[in-house]
Amino acid sequence: MTSNHYLGAAAAGFIVLLAACAAQTQQSADGVTIGDSDLGGVVTSATGPEAGVWVIAETTDLPTKYAKMVVTDERGRYVVPGLPRASYNVWVRGYGLVDSPKVRTAPGKLLNLTAVPAPNDAAAAQYYPAIYWYSMLQIPPAGEFGGYTRIPKDRTQADWLKQVKNIGCIGCHQLGQSSTRTIPSAFADIKSSEEAWVRRLQSGQSGEQMTNQLAGNFGGAPYKYYADWTDRIAKGELPFAKPPRPQGVERNLVVTSWEWSTEKHYLHDLIASDRRNPTVNSYGPLFGSPEYSTDNMPILDPRTHKVTTFKMPVADPSMPEALGPGHAASLRPLAPSAYWGEEKLWDTRANNHNAMFDKQGRVWMAATVRDRPNPAFCKKGSEHPSAKVFPLEMSSRQVAMLDPKTMKYTFIDTCFGTHHPQFGYDADNTLWLSGTGPVAGWVNTKVFEQTGDAARSQGWAPFVLDTNGNGRLDEFIDPKSPIDPSKDKQIIPGSGPYAVMPSPVDGSIWYTVGVFGGPPGFLRFDPKTRLSEVYHVPAPYFGIRGGDIDKDGVAWGSASSGHLASFDRRKCKGPLNGPKATGDHCPEGWSFYQYPGPGFRGLGENSAESSYYTWVDQHNTLGLGENVPMSTANLNDGFVALKDGKMILLRIPYPLGFYAKGFDGRIDDPGAGWKGRGLWSTNGDRTPWLMEGGKGAKPRAVQIQLRPDPLAR
């Protein structure tokens, strides 16, 4: 072949390559560039470009319902990147708008969309996050506490706020979305709204727990306030505040969601990776924790969009269900549901509350393996080293491990209860648990792998303050005895450990404590000395729920007062042990950052946000940087991050009513930029049918990613 032939062939190949590139990308006159798997265009209304609104693309063509959501830039431009090949419904949603008509299309097209301004404030308010409606709830003024009204004498205004926020009602549900700010039609014939609320909260397998909280703990007084709230809304009262549209970096979010589990079963959490090593399980499946709802663990493969289930076993198949006394759900509905009648929905034995990956890619769960009474090695008279110090009679949940490679499920019978698991940073890969009651509890997973002996692999120890100040664990007095400066003192930290957080700095173990009773705060346990320190939330702040720790050893938590709380032990000025170091000795270690959103009126500056859990992005899995604390924003339809002193909202705009109890971060490909990393979570409301979509709606797993700009592909 001559050189001219070579040149001719090369030129032809170059032309083909150019044609292929042209087919792969398109650019609009507005500067929107898309590829074959993208959608892009401009959103406008009669008033011009619509900035900071969402474009939502959803399909049912894949193995499970799938949606991807983005935010428009300052010129109304958008790009929905990386859509699987399918046919999509696409529409616009935003504050000040009503949903636009859905347009049917496929990826690879430039698609301009027309937004629809809301005809009035009432129509616009239907799309507001729940907090804008829930903040309309009236709170009894301070003068109504102290035994002068129906409110029991021993209940304070802070107790009331904890109940109507993240320690009580918002601990299981988002209140303020459409389903909860109205009365179900099934109860419409009840003669008074207050009686309708009494009946409503008796419904289903949580009816007993809800009734005990409001009628038992608060004398039934809250019913009146909830009735007044829904009455005012039914008469046309609207939120007194309006939500701002996403601004700045909030417009760079890409949210992807998949339906999973069933319309009758909720999920408490999901797990994606090892929080210490977030490249573990890269591009791998997500595992859901269905808690009280079912033994069927949903597993989502985000690459194929397929959802499968694994039925979690228990060691004794004849054991009773993990429902009823000792649990936060009942065997049967207290009264028929407005949605499901007398049907019993929940039937779990495994009761998988929460899970964590280890560095080998195995899933370790806080899950029930047998009935509540403990085996003999846990009890008084046992030769187990921990039982000699502090015997334990029963536990309602233990530990299990699933190996996704083989799907082998292993039981680890613990004497202490479990709730949230977290791996430490030690050579033994110690698994630390919360929900352990009066003790710190752990499993040495290295020993368990070597021996398979659950008894030998576990340990526990009571929480003991070094009140004699000598730095050693000595003879200690019981929790009810007054301080003796010559001895140490055991404490029961209120309702016990709730969140658990091993420190990457010094190996100490931190917990949130006093969540459901007793003084709330953080507790530090030293595995080497077996000594504890406790730090109470200082007034005027109150309450705490989930928490985490950052790479500097600073503890962070979701405070009931509507704040992200932090505690830095390094700021303490006085002694950390001794007879005065009993919880109130270091207020200077605390800092508080108010969550976004309106507050309840009559209480001064506050936020009604009722965050369930806080997590620290130690490894920049989202893209805001390392060591960024984030909280579930349970009334703001998503999450909130604290970056450089500013709160950044990470909203899930669809379906309305997104409510999470936790989240995780994963780096699938460190070299793939924003596409290779993201946060993962799932809708965790106990009643999926209360979110947008109503009866038949399923929980959604979500991935949140952060682009460098709203048009990045």
Each language-model region and where it sits:
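Short, acidic Ser/Thr/Gly-rich low-complexity loop/linker segments typical of extracellular
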Residues: 33, 60-82
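A short, solvent-exposed loop/turn motif at the edges and junctions
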Residues: 59-65, 87, 91-108
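Short Pro-Gly-centered beta-turn/loop motif in secreted/extracellular proteins
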Residues: 49-50, 79-87, 95
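Structural signature of eukaryotic scaffold interfaces centered on beta-propeller domains
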Residues: 259-282, 342-360, 420-428, 489-506, ...
